Design a protein with these regions (language model features):
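Extracellular "spike/adhesin" assembly and maturation modules
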Residues: 1-43
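Extracellular jelly-roll beta-sandwich "head" domains, especially the C-terminal globular C1q domain
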Residues: 27-204
């Protein structure tokens, strides 16, 4: 799999500094892909479009992964995934499973935007969180959060968050998740997403 070291190694080979006798060792198709992506980028987007929004119950104080399918006509908008030497590479937009899966090792910009309402009239602070998960392991929060206070079930509100994540240490893949936390102190609340986008693109 590609790493910053592999990128430097591939760059050295492709610029001819060690190509003649290959003193730095063999380069693989995966390394070449990683090198190419560092220049042109890997990418993926899932989105929730117009539909009939459905309520997603979030327990008091709990954080839940946003259900992109709930009443939405959304889809995998675009992605860049493929196979090199029987190994899955690139980035996979996975609307059906509420995630973007990154197979490549590198640095990715993540952008999240959500238009939403709540169905109750309580005062609730909703916190939207970008989360990552290494090959089915623990969910990690890199600190890219955004909070919105809702006091009524009326107009839509918007929330957005962004940041750069590091996938160079993952085992097989990194899942990128959009999550929402119910900040009400005592009751479950219903969150309703009208529109939303979750995107990643490679920056290094």
């Amino acid at each position: 799999m590609g790493t910053p070291t592999a990128l430097r190694k591939t760059r050295a080979v492709l610029t001819g500094t060690s190509f003649a006798d290959n003193t730095t060792g063999a380069i693989t198709a995966q390394m070449v892909r990683q090198f190419t992506e560092s220049g042109m980028g890997g990418y993926a987007t899932i989105c929730a479009k117009a539909g009939t929004p459905a309520s997603q119950a979030v327990a008091s104080g709990a954080t839940a992964t946003i259900d992109w399918n709930a009443g939405s006509t959304g889809a995998d908008a675009v992605d860049d995934t493929g196979t090199v030497s029987s190994t899955t590479v690139g980035t996979d937009a996975d609307f059906a499973n509420d995630r973007i899966r990154i197979y490549d090792k590198g640095f990715f910009m993540v952008n999240l935007g959500v238009s939403f309402v709540q169905t109750g009239t309580d005062t609730v602070i909703w916190t939207f969180r970008i989360a990552t998960q290494d090959t089915g392991g623990s969910v990690v929060y890199p600190g890219y959060d955004a909070a919105v206070q809702k006091v009524a079930a009326t107009l839509d509100n918007m929330a957005s968050a962004s940041g750069i994540i590091d996938t160079t240490g993952h085992t097989t893949y990194t899942d990128v998740l959009a999550q929402v936390k119910n900040g009400h102190g005592s009751s479950s609340e219903n969150f309703q997403m009208h529109y939303g986008q979750l995107s990643v693109f490679r920056v290094g």
